[in-house]
């Protein structure tokens, strides 16, 4: 099954967020939230920069999104979500979570599964033209 190219495009934006975190002295984790193939929020890990243990990449992205309905949204995150972030994604009913890397940190895909939120890890092979 071919992976839609838009997933790679949005993951690249999440990677740019991770790079922004690195530039600020933080951890390299980024996220973007989309609806109708448009980015509606972005964020990166701010745990170190703001001395706040809950400001993971996904949480920063959700915070930027504000009090919207998360129905029909897709979260792209560079690293598999932790229990806190997976719980927030489940609570707000994000429709799909696309994960960039799930080997370094396996995360809590079981939480997403329990709440019926599909999670998909992008293949590590290079994007084909």
Residue ranges and their predicted role:
Residues 41-129:
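Zn2+-dependent cytidine deaminase-like catalytic core
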Residues 3-24:
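Short, basic/aromatic recognition patches
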Residues 2-4, 35, 115:
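General secondary-structure propensity
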Residues 14, 18-21, 31, 57, ...:
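Small-residue (primarily alanine) positions within well-ordered alpha-helices
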Residues 24-28, 70-72:
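Short secondary-structure junction motifs
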Residues 15, 21, 36-43:
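A short, flexible N-terminal coil/short beta segment enriched in small residues
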Residues 28-29, 107:
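Alpha-helix N-cap and coil->helix boundary residues
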Residues 29-37:
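Short beta-strand scaffold segments in enzyme catalytic cores
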